[in-house]
């Protein structure tokens, strides 16, 4: 009887080891470039600011993520205030640890996310500083009613105070600017 019990224990251990080996082998076959899905949060250091609504984040595994700030649209670099709006975003986040709450992936493969720095909503701050429009076309999909109202209010205040892009009499929205330009790959 002792031999039978010992054999069962050995088989149980062998099967457990085999199961673990299969599990880890399956995990190791995931591509290194596997991207976080909608609803996930990426924490990491901002290693590059491309423009007023796009940055590159490096996570703790060393993987870089191209992030498009959700619910806003900043002037293109070729537009008036484009470089100033990029520089304002860089002042806030470059080489700092942030959290990116993923809401979508855009047609260029960038993760669309709400960026937080120490709990502060950086996307809304860009709007409040007059460095971006509240991108209402997409914001309704991602924002709660309270967030939507807060962004709309931030834009209205920036406009009334003539901050950033609102210094111009009639600033051209980036989506109008892009519509008039030849289609180019996004950063």
Please give the residue ranges for each predicted region.
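Small beta-barrel nucleic-acid-binding modules, primarily SNase/OB-fold domains
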Residues: 2-19, 23-187
